[in-house]
Amino acid sequence: MRWIYISPHLDDAILSAGGLIYDQARAGTRVETWTLMCGFPPEADPSPFAQVLHFQWGFASAEETVRLRRAEDARAASRVGAQAVHFDDFPDCIYRRGADGEPLYP
C-alpha cells in the first residue's frame, strides 16, 4: 500500500499531517508528499512583495528561495519517513502573474 499526501505548498503536508505520516511510515507503509505549487518562477524580476520576503528570509533570489525551501521540505518529509515529490508546473503564489503580466501579489 502507498499513501500520497497532496500538499498545495511546501511544508503543508508535514505541518498538517506529520504525526499521521510518521505513524504510517513507521508501520511500513510507503508514504509520499506531493507538493504542487513549488515550481521555479520564470521571471528574473520578482514582485516587490516577493523581494521583501526574500530579504526577510535572508535569500538572494527567487531561485535560491525555491531551491532551499524544496530542500527543507524534503528533509522534513524524510524525518517523518516520507519521500517528497516536487512538481515544477506552478510557482508559489508570490511568483504568479496575471494575464497582463502584472504580479498577482504586488
Task: Give the residues covered by each predicted segment.
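Active-site beta-strand->loop->alpha-helix modules in alpha/beta enzyme cores, enriched
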Residues: 1-106
